[in-house]
Amino acid sequence: MKSKEILGYDIKEISNQTVEQLIEKKKELQGKLNDLQQELLKRKVEARMGTLKNTASIRNLRKDIARILTLLSIINKEIENKKKESKK
């Protein structure tokens, strides 16, 4: 059975990483998220002005943002679980 991937990140791989690695991935994803949000804002302005050529790009950016938010949620839960396990 093939494991699920989101934006090139294997979900099963995430659970096998250390807290430090997860925090590093989280920072990387937050940077990508900020970039995508800025790009989405630019595209929305272009759409308002009528200069946007590819209207589907807004929808695709929103989907990518949702994927990153999903990954961040998974990573945050995994970090919490690993911290709880280390306290035991």
From Swiss-Prot:
Keyword annotations from UniProtKB, A to Z: Ribonucleoprotein, Ribosomal protein
GO CC annotation: ribonucleoprotein complex; ribosome
Cited SUPFAM superfamilies: Ribosomal protein L29 (L29p)
Disulfide bridge partners, by residue number: none
UniProt cross-references to Gene3D superfamilies, sorted A to Z: 1.10.287.310
Swiss-Prot/TrEMBL GO biological process terms: translation
Keyword NADP included in the entry's annotation: no
GO terms for MF: structural constituent of ribosome
Origin: domain of life: Archaea
Homology family: Belongs to the universal ribosomal protein uL29 family.
HAMAP family: Ribosomal_uL29
Name of this chain's protein: Large ribosomal subunit protein uL29
Species for this entry: Sulfurisphaera tokodaii (strain DSM 16993 / JCM 10545 / NBRC 100140 / 7) (Sulfolobus tokodaii)
Gene name of the encoded protein: rpl29
